[in-house]
Regions:
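Conserved class I S-adenosyl-L-methionine
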Residues: 38-99, 111-115, 246-248
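N-terminal auxiliary segments of SAM/dcSAM-dependent transferases
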Residues: 7-63
Length: 325
């Protein structure tokens, strides 16, 4: 009697995607973000006039008054693009570093307010002070050239954080003299006479300043030496020549609609300011048009005894090259 043949079932086939799930998900998210950015640029360009203009701020017209007109609708017009392009995430990361006496210039509609780690004085419903909340921000001064933008930002703060004291809202040009931190904070810190800020914040502000170099130099005068930091999230020229050509071509139309010149050379502006670069990099998924920048006030030449013969401008350039190239 023949022996029955025993056949075993074939081994299960391995899932070819088993070890590729994370790369596929990451790649899909990256592709979606980049596609969204391209869509945003296309939609914006389709509404703008095509007239190539210079990227130099000295040759660009002042469009800052546009913000008084669009202040009430500004948040609605940029909310979805900032979320899709992960600019909101960059804001959160930037604001997590703010501490002490904080100055935010180009406050706009206050899109950063909810991301600060507030530690301001509290008051009850009757206006009586009842202590201080725990947090890193001890005082807050906001500046913007647009009165309507400041009004929107202040209203937003009062809704988000009712009962908090220690904020000041100033309508003015941030490239001119800015008030020192509140006197009570200075006395509490025991640094009476220095009167400088611990942190200066600006997001998407260099694009609308008439003289961005003068603005940065003024911020350098406002921040503490050594420990103070100027934290910027900005947009300007990108990594590719063709993209910069597109930005130049449609810059005027975009400026008239949104009040900002999106084709400025941020690297050149930063270097011309004379401030020391702590960290600076462009966001690759935006084609290099969005920049994270951390600056500090340079030490006085007399204190740099080891290299006084090196001009400050050259020294800053060499430091930047070490960080970038």
């Amino acid at each position: 009697m023949p022996t029955p043949r025993v056949t075993s079932s074939p081994p299960p086939r391995a899932n070819p995607l088993r070890y590729r799930t994370i790369p596929i998900i990451f790649g899909s998210i990256t592709l979606f973000a980049f596609s969204s950015y391209c869509t945003y640029v296309y939609i914006t360009l389709s509404r703008a006039s095509a007239s190539t203009v210079s990227s130099s701020p000295s040759e660009q017209t002042d469009v800052s008054t546009r913000y008084d007109t669009i202040a009430r609708s500004f948040d609605t017009s940029v909310d979805w693009t900032e979320k899709v392009l992960r600019i909101t995430k960059l804001r959160k990361k930037l604001l997590s570093q703010a501490h002490g006496d904080v100055l935010e210039v180009s406050i706009g509609t206050g899109r950063n307010l909810e991301y600060y780690n507030w530690g301001l004085t509290l008051r009850d419903g009757k206006g009586k002070e009842v202590g201080e909340s725990k947090g890193k921000v001890k005082s807050f001064t906001a500046v913007d050239i647009s009165e309507e933008m400041v009004n929107v930002a202040r209203e937003k703060f009062l809704k988000l954080f009712p009962g908090k004291l220690g904020t000041r809202w100033i309508v003015g040009d941030a490239s001119t003299e800015i008030p020192s931190p509140p006197m009570d904070t200075i006395e509490r810190d025991g640094t009476l006479g220095k009167r400088k800020y611990d942190t200066v914040i600006q997001t998407m502000g260099l694009c609308s300043a008439n003289d961005p170099v003068a603005l940065l130099k003024n911020l350098g005068d406002c921040v503490k030496e050594d420990s103070g930091r100027i934290l910027l999230l900005e947009h300007g020229r990108g990594n590719w020549k063709w993209l910069n050509g597109v930005l130049d071509k449609f810059a005027e139309g975009h400026a008239k609609e949104f009040g900002c010149w999106w084709n400025r050379d941020l690297e050149g502006i930063i270097k011309d300011s004379g401030l020391d670069i702590v960290d600076m990099y462009s966001v690759w998924w935006h084609g290099g048009t969005t920049w994270w920048i951390e600056l500090k006030k340079p030490k006085a030449i007399s204190e740099n005894t080891e290299d006084q013969d090196i001009p400050p401008k050259l020294r800053n350039d060499e430091e930047a090259k070490k960080k970038w190239w």
